[in-house]
A protein has these predicted regions:
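Active-site helical microenvironments for divalent-metal-assisted chemistry
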Residues: 1-179
């Protein structure tokens, strides 16, 4: 199932790049899957991690399609990790923080891995780009982006405080945005 998810995600993310870079987008879902695999060996969860942005960011991909190709559970996990793009950035991110506080552990794992992959990119690119880095995002204010990353850190603290991926995430949040 994991290989099938890799193949599908590679196909539907073709031609997409990480914001403000020339890195192929598929690098991100692959990293999210790898991070999740450090927390579970469940192939449905790992596959959902790899597929986590397909409904949200790939034209024509639906939950029904993922259910038919993979499983109902994988489709549900991807759907629970998808944002409502009709809402503002603040509304979406506030909803994500609230959702992660109460979501099932599997959804929290994917959320943690997604945000860890994103903040690793920020940490990697910041020394080269400096403050210009924030211009690549929809929300361009570093302080507001920091509010979001800190909110996610707090939302996941009780469930993951001893998990290496969370410890790395918390450390990068503090490094980039302060305490």
């Amino acid at each position: 199932m994991v290989q099938k998810a890799i193949d599908f995600a590679t196909k539907v993310h073709e031609g997409q790049y990480r914001k403000g870079t020339d890195r192929p987008y598929i690098v991100h879902p692959m990293e999210v899957g790898k991070i999740v695999s450090t927390m579970t060996q469940d192939e449905e969860i790992i596959s959902a991690a790899i597929l986590h942005d397909t409904i949200e960011d790939c034209e024509g991909v639906t939950a029904k399609m993922i259910e038919q190709m993979f499983s109902k559970r994988a489709a549900e996990l991807v759907q629970k990790e998808s944002e409502d793009k009709s809402k503002t950035w603040m509304e979406r991110k506030g909803a994500t923080i609230q959702h992660l506080k109460v979501a099932e552990r599997e959804v929290q794992m994917i959320g943690l891995a997604d945000k860890l992959s994103n903040i690793r990119d920020i940490d990697r690119d910041y020394p080269e780009c400096g403050e210009e880095l924030w211009q690549r995002f929809r929300m361009k204010d570093k302080e507001t982006i920091g509010w979001y990353y800190k909110g996610v850190e707090e939302a996941l603290r009780n469930s993951f405080s001893e998990v290496p991926a969370y410890i790395e995430y918390r450390s990068l949040v503090e490094k980039i945005f302060g305490k």
